[in-house]
Amino acid sequence: MKENFWSELPRPFFILAPMEDVTDIVFRHVVSEAARPDVFFTEFTNTESFCHPEGIHSVRGRLTFSEDEQPMVAHIWGDKPEQFRETSIQLAKMGFKGIDLNMGCPVANVAKKGKGSGLILRPDVAAEIIQATKAGGLPVSVKTRLGYYEIDEWKDWLKHVFEQDIANLSIHLRTRKEMSKVDAHWELIEAIKNLRDEIAPNTLLTINGDIPDRKTGLELAEKYGIDGVMIGRGIFHNPFAFEKEPREHTSKELLDLLRLHLSLFNKYEKDEIRQFKSLRRFFKIYVRGIRGASELRHQLMNTQSIAEARALLDEFEAQMDEDVKIEL
């Protein structure tokens, strides 16, 4: 194996969760500007497309990263071990520091085809995939859920995953069936850690689910002794979620992050052509807590270009009464 960056991380370490159509190079740089985590994962990259001579062009932009983001982990999904083997070899050549396997995506057209969380029901295939991915020489990690249908599935499923000798397990503390409709099962963290200690003491354990910020993550790490904390949806509520010393933030800071997001979208669109409308999911992160925020969000949702969005921001900020402190 090439150098295992996981062993060099602080304890606990913090990771921005991989999120489809969210954690591209643009948003990762915005998060870095606000308060960066210790590790970044890419968006989801399909191994079948990556291995296809034509499909590679449709996914290459998902793997775009810059050296200042290191350690960078490629998050990949599929169900054909040989494709994982081939992909892992190429990812190592591209400069990634690790590979993370998606065994937790709950989306129906993924899971019901035996991919993502569907691999929970195919443990033998999951094991083959893990071993095949080691061909690239990078440390292999897994992101998964407690089970597919029932919470109690975690015992057999996670035991099986721990037996595969992986670098890190990120466990989303819900089942596939639960999606994100119920509270994450923090009450299971201690038992999962005990299982890890028994089966694979050298595998790092990262928890995920309902963790809004670094402060909460530190409290959980102190209580349970886990190695890492992964924050996903919490970043939408607080782009400063990874801040080491929390402080008050203002509406101007959030709007400045939006301007940065727009600029980076322009900069990197040559690497992966994305329609402008893909930006709309982010506006609610930056525009809130000030007079006129609702109307500005509505107007931004109807813009068709970076130039239009910037013009709206210029007009809005010129009329702002004051820089308001924001509750995050």
UniProtKB/Swiss-Prot annotation:
EC id: 1.3.1.-
Function (record text): Catalyzes the synthesis of 5,6-dihydrouridine (D), a modified base found in the D-loop of most tRNAs, via the reduction of the C5-C6 double bond in target uridines.
Signal peptide (from-to): none
Cofactor: FMN
Primary enzyme class: oxidoreductase
Residues that, per the record, bind FMN: P18, M19, E20, K143, N208, G209, D210, G232, R233
One Pfam assignment: Dus
Tree of life domain: Bacteria
Keyword entries, A-Z: Flavoprotein, FMN, NADP, Oxidoreductase, RNA-binding, tRNA processing, tRNA-binding
Protein name: Probable tRNA-dihydrouridine synthase
Active site as annotated: C105
Organism: Staphylococcus aureus (strain COL)
Cystine bridges: none
Reaction(s) catalysed (UniProt annotation): a 5,6-dihydrouridine in tRNA + NAD(+) = a uridine in tRNA + NADH + H(+); a 5,6-dihydrouridine in tRNA + NADP(+) = a uridine in tRNA + NADPH + H(+)
Entry annotated with the keyword Cell wall biogenesis/degradation: no
Family affiliation: Belongs to the Dus family.
GO terms of molecular function: flavin adenine dinucleotide binding; tRNA binding; tRNA dihydrouridine synthase activity
